Amino acid sequence: MFKLTSRLVTSRFAASSRLATARTIVLPRPHPSWISFQAKRFNSTGPNANDVSEIQTQLPSIDELTSSAPSLSASTSDLIANTTQTVGELSSHIGYLNSIGLAQTWYWPSDIIQHVLEAVHVYSGLPWWGTIAATTILIRCLMFPLYVKSSDTVARNSHIKPELDALNNKLMSTTDLQQGQLVAMQRKKLLSSHGIKNRWLAAPMLQIPIALGFFNALRHMANYPVDGFANQGVAWFTDLTQADPYLGLQVITAAVFISFTRLGGETGAQQFSSPMKRLFTILPIISIPATMNLSSAVVLYFAFNGAFSVLQTMILRNKWVRSKLKITEVAKPRTPIAGASPTENMGIFQSLKHNIQKARDQAERRQLMQDNEKKLQESFKEKRQNSKIKIVHKSNFINNKK
């Protein structure tokens, strides 16, 4: 019995030992990555002395960082400066305005002005405020000979002003066609005898399309805005796309326009009446609030154009310049001849009312002259019809006799 029990225990122990051996064999071996991971984990708690010394030598100290701070700020400022310099580089090439939809033609005034502005800006290297000023002065210099001829014509007219006013009043007051033609011939003879060609009086009118071209060109360029317009101003108006916050340009423009009007206009020879002088004093003052919302680029053109007008007026009023350019001296005002209607002592509104009534009377007289001309033509046709010779055939004469 005991032997049987011992055999059973021995057999069970042997079986369990074999099972344990089998389990030991079946268990998988750990992966090398796990071992390396565990090794790295345990190694992190105890760093190598060589690694620590290498890190310490590579990292800069606090003193080194503090000493390098000025150089870092200097490099940052240089980067900002270089970035600022790149602004405006796009507009320094011919064709830039055309690429953004501006300066499309060569016949429209604003497009022509934009082409000229771009050429001056690219080839001169001036900032945009200098480009506007230089272009304005360049165009006014090209127009100076026309103003010289206009000034000479105005001065020649001043010598015959009383006689010319009398003939003009006769021409406007007559209702007889033949009498009007006779007065017109007398007026033409008077002008030709003094070498006067009134077509030169229209020379300053060329400034109107040029001024409108500048206005539209600069307004579109500021609204886009053109590259460089936002930072290539000067003084207190560095941004040409915005309105002048202090209205300084508007005040300067009004002052220069009043000045050259007082000096005798752009030809330096015009003699404005008192009502016209008062009118040309009030209008520039009214223009200050009217132009307060315009961009600085537009008002800058007005300011430089007005300043050049003052300079031109002072030059054309100089006696030495007039003698060198062979410009006739302006005659002093004389007493009007009978038949002239001076309006020197009238106020602004009285003068305006007088001119309106004068234009109305002139229109009525013109209509009356046209009616008289039609009546003369009809009477002439009737007389011509009655004066025709009637041809009578012999057969008709015999028949009538029978």
Curated annotation (Swiss-Prot):
Main location: mitochondrion
Protein origin, superkingdom: Eukaryota
Cellular component per GO, a single term: mitochondrial inner boundary membrane
Keywords: Membrane, Mitochondrion, Mitochondrion inner membrane, Transit peptide, Transmembrane, Transmembrane helix
Location in or out of the cell: Mitochondrion inner membrane
Membrane-crossing residue ranges in chain numbering: 119-139, 200-220, 240-260, 276-292, 298-316
InterPro entries to which the protein is assigned, alphabetical: YidC/ALB3/OXA1/COX18, YidC/Oxa/ALB_C
Organism from which the protein derives: Saccharomyces cerevisiae (strain ATCC 204508 / S288c) (Baker's yeast)
Pfam families: 60KD_IMP
Stretches assigned to the Mitochondrial intermembrane side: 43-118, 221-239, 293-297
GO molecular function: membrane insertase activity; mitochondrial ribosome binding
Remarks, miscellaneous: Present with 6550 molecules/cell in log phase SD medium.
Keyword set includes Transit peptide: yes
Family named by the database record: Belongs to the OXA1/ALB3/YidC family.
Gene Ontology biological process terms, A to Z: mitochondrial proton-transporting ATP synthase complex assembly; protein insertion into mitochondrial inner membrane; protein insertion into mitochondrial inner membrane from matrix
Region (Disordered): 366-386
Transit peptide, start-end: 1-42
Assembly notes: Interacts with the large ribosome subunit of mitochondrial ribosome. Interacts directly with MRP20. Interacts with OXA1.
Function, as annotated: Mitochondrial inner membrane insertase that mediates the insertion of both mitochondrion-encoded precursors and nuclear-encoded proteins from the matrix into the inner membrane. Links mitoribosomes with the inner membrane. Forms pores capable of accommodating translocating protein segments. Essential for the activity and assembly of cytochrome c oxidase. Plays a central role in the translocation and export of the N-terminal part of the COX2 protein into the mitochondrial intermembrane space.
Membrane topology label: Multi-pass membrane protein
Keyword Membrane on entry: yes
This protein's name: Mitochondrial inner membrane protein OXA1
Residue stretches of biased makeup (Basic and acidic residues): 366-385
Disruption phenotype: Leads to reduced steady-state levels and activities of the mitochondrial ATP/ADP carrier protein AAC2.
Membrane topology (Mitochondrial matrix): 140-199, 261-275, 317-402
